[in-house]
Amino acid sequence: MSHKLLAFPRLNYISNFNFFYKNTTKNLILDQNFIGNLYLTSTPTCRKLVTIPSNRNIMTTSSNLKESDSGSILENVATKVLNCQEPEAKSSQKIDTDKVSSNKVESTHIPFKVVPKELNKSSSATATSSSKTKTNLRSIIQPYVKLTKPNLTILVTLSSICSYAISPYTVSLPELLFLTMGTALCSGAANAINMGREPEFDKKMPRTVGRPVVRGLISPKQAYQFAGITGSLGCTMLFLGVNPTVSFLGFLNIVLYSWIYTSLKRKSIINTWVGAIVGAIPPLMGWAASSPLDHPGAWCLAGLLYAWQFPHFNALSHNIADQYKGAGYVMTAAENPKLNARVALRYSLLMFPLCFGLSYFGITDWVFQFDSAIANSWLTYLAYKFWMQIKQNYTGQKPTANGIAMANIHAKKLFWGSVWHLPAVLILAMLHKKGQWDRLLIYSGLKSHDHKSQSSNNIGLI
């Protein structure tokens, strides 16, 4: 039990600490405080009490032992105060009230009152119940958050937001908020259905064995119910807050990912191409929120996300190809490693003309070609190294252990290169959006507004 030490007003001033010494009986009869004005007003310092031997003979009687015990109690208390210990500190220097009473030391003889610090039972019960409520609420919400695959949902939502920002027409903040929330809800619904359909397969892979449906935290039925609620909310928000086209694309993405792609994963390697279409729809959603889909720039952005899926996923699936095969999934990395690496290189090269199309159709300025070429060249180089190693491993002989290890290393480099590549290209496209810097200079007053050139730019964008 912790104690709160409350100091009584002192009665007299004592210039020394003789009553601490064990060769005197003053410690039981003094009614004065042992601390003077000097020690109450100055900064406390740690003092080590040294016993000064007396010339008188000390009789080892029972009364002297009792006096010694009582003196040690007060000495321990005083030492604790002088050492500035916290009330909650666990120490051997505690006041044993039972021992004090047994030695007939009255509380008035102690220079300060000892008040036990006890928690109110009602407040303690309230704090305990609130902590349990928070824990229970977290244990309920967390599995549903994991059910949405938050990392993938964030990536899908960001690709939609970036496309909305790159589109040539003005940006509306309420429209952007509805687009963000609706896209995230639709993506979460698709992922929830995907997890609800594959617990028997996911439990066979170390990568997916920790998913909430596999662990039994959520049943497949609950996953479907959650997907129905979030999907309905997402499509409704997109329909009312953005436009019907975006709402339809969100619903189409749920169907493609959760039913068609998920079913094809166990039947054919074509599932990778279908999954790439799923990744290309969010940029179309962002573009359609402010601009018509008949503009070629929309399809250049969608093509960019479509092509990016292959070096990203093919590199990821290469290192876990055996896990996919053991779980019953049909993936290109497990069925045909050479095709897997070749497709990754092929679509890395496709990034160059797609970025060129953004400048050609007036979405970005021509400086974007030089900036994006650096990122595209790096990704293509990593894909080329990966393809060359796979080609060497499967040319006329069984791959060696060193060759397999090198292929795994190049696959990891390509995967992390793709993780950095996509944000870099999208950010560069937003920075080099057509007329972006002119609008900034006009807004800051560094450039005069040219209505004629502005109207011609708008006509060219339409």
Swiss-Prot record:
Its EC number is 2.5.1.-. GO terms for molecular function: protoheme IX farnesyltransferase activity. It is a multi-pass membrane protein. GO terms for cellular component: mitochondrial membrane. It is found in: Mitochondrion membrane. InterPro entries: Protohaem_IX_farnesylTrfase, Protohaem_IX_farnesylTrfase_mt, UbiA_prenyltransferase, UbiA_prenylTrfase_CS, UbiA_sf. The chain crosses the membrane at residues 152-172, 173-193, 237-257, 269-289, 296-316, 348-368, 411-431. It is an enzyme of class 2 (transferase). Keywords: Heme biosynthesis, Membrane, Mitochondrion, Transferase, Transit peptide, Transmembrane, Transmembrane helix. It comes from the Eukaryota. Its main location: mitochondrion. One of its GO terms (biological process) is heme A biosynthetic process. Converts protoheme IX and farnesyl diphosphate to heme O. Belongs to the UbiA prenyltransferase family. This is Protoheme IX farnesyltransferase, mitochondrial. It comes from Debaryomyces hansenii (strain ATCC 36239 / CBS 767 / BCRC 21394 / JCM 1990 / NBRC 0083 / IGC 2968) (Yeast). The lineage of its organism: Eukaryota, Fungi, Dikarya, Ascomycota, Saccharomycotina.
